[in-house]
Every structure is written in structure tokens, then in C-alpha cells.
Design a protein with these regions (language model features):
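Extended recognition/assembly regions associated with phosphoester-bond processing machinery
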Residues: 1-73, 78-211
Length: 211
């Protein structure tokens, strides 16, 4: 799905990423790498191959877009270092894109790990009229791209049936990104007037008519 914001074009992909066409930037939020290994360490029966699924999905998205830069909108790594960092380190050596991290609340590992991989780190980034943060933020004259919330939407069906989907949640001056990572869950938001919801299905991103 392609949307236009402030005369710039963005392709919203069902992976939960967005490609900024004019800047050749791929925007991704909330990978939470390391979370699967953390759960496995504490006895949860999650298949080890699930660790590699995030990287397979990343490669799939990179194959679709001519991205020169990847900006992670926070919570790239879940908490303490574990063996998933080695997978991530190896993955970065297979790509050519410039990597940037906007720090999130879970990004607590030493910055040296990132600098060793030539990943730039910022608390926020301003590009033209766009403010890129992890936590939702409002600033006059800027449109905010952010994550943190892991937005989802519940759609009512027949009777008591509901369909729950991750989504891009758009407010007049903000777009909240869904979580990219596996096993991260959703926080279900209730749209207000002038909000727009772009729900993620297995095949595409679709705008939900809220009226």
C-alpha cells in the first residue's frame, strides 16, 4: 500500500516495514532480537528455527525495495546480549545498507556492540519535516514516525467473533509502526476521529474504514 505524507511517498508492507521512496530508506520498528533466545533460556518451548525467521523476513523485504539505508525505530535488541546477537552480527555482514538505530527503552546493551557493526545510534532523527523517534512524540510542524506501542486493531465480525490484526496506526501528525519481531504481541488501539488504520494481513496492507 502506498501513502503520501507531506508530499513524500511511503510503501507500507505487510511485514510491518515502510519504504520511503524519495529517500530510499527502509523504516522498521521493534524487532526485539534476543527475545526468543531469552524465552528459550527460561524454558519456553519455542523452536530454535524461529530465531532465523526475523532475518529471513528482513531479507525478503530488502529484496523488494531499493533501500540504501535502514532505520530501526527502537527496540532492536530486547535486553541482555545472547546468541541472537551473533546471528544479527552475521546478517549485517551480508547486506550493503547503511544502518541507523533510534534508541528505544529496550536498547540497553553497550553501544560498543553497535559501533563494532558500524551502526549509528541517535535518540531521535529529523529528516526534512519528519521526526523519527521510538516513543510516540508530538512536535509542532513535524510528522512523527514511531514505534513502541505495537499497535493492533480488533475488527468485529458476526455475533461475538473478532479478528485481531497488527496495524500501522495513523494520527493526523503521526504514524505508529507495528512490531516487526516475532512473539512481541499487540496493544489494541481504539481509533478516534481523524485516525486512520492500515491493517496487516498475510498478503497485503489494507485501510480499514472506521465509519
Amino acid at each position: 500500500m502506498r501513502i503520501s505524507i507531506k508530499n513524500q511517498n511511503f510503501v507500507l508492507h505487510q511485514s510491518g516495514t515502510a519504504f520511503w521512496e524519495e529517500k530510499k530508506i527502509l523504516l522498521i520498528s521493534d524487532l526485539h532480537l534476543g527475545k526468543i533466545a531469552h524465552f528459550r533460556k527460561h524454558g519456553m518451548a519455542i523452536p530454535e528455527k524461529a530465531v532465523l525467521e526475523n532475518f529471513a523476513r528482513l531479507n525478503e523485504v530488502l529484496g523488494l525495495f531499493d533501500a540504501e539505508t535502514i532505520i530501526f525505530l527502537g527496540d532492536l535488541f530486547h535486553s541482555k546480549i545472547n546468541n541472537e546477537w551473533d546471528f544479527f552480527s552475521d546478517w549485517t555482514k551480508t547486506i550493503t545498507q547503511h544502518l541507523i538505530l533510534v534508541e528505544g527503552n529496550h536498547d540497553i546493551i553497550s553501544k560498543k556492540y553497535y559501533s563494532d557493526l558500524k551502526i549509528e545510534i541517535y535518540s531521535e532523527i529529523i529528516i526534512d519535516d519528519f521526526l523519527l523517534t521510538h516513543h510516540p512524540s508530538e512536535r509542532e510542524n513535524f510528522f512523527n514516525f514511531c514505534g513502541h506501542i505495537h499497535p493492533g486493531i480488533k475488527l468485529k465480525g458476526i455475533g461475538r467473533q473478532f479478528l485481531s490484526l497488527a496495524c500501522f496506526f495513523r494520527k493526523p501528525n503521526q504514524l505508529i509502526f507495528p512490531s516487526f519481531g516475532e512473539f512481541t504481541g499487540n496493544f489494541y488501539l481504539v481509533p478516534e476521529e481523524n485516525d486512520q488504520v492500515y491493517a496487516i494481513t498475510n498478503e497485503e496492507v489494507i485501510e480499514i474504514a472506521m465509519s
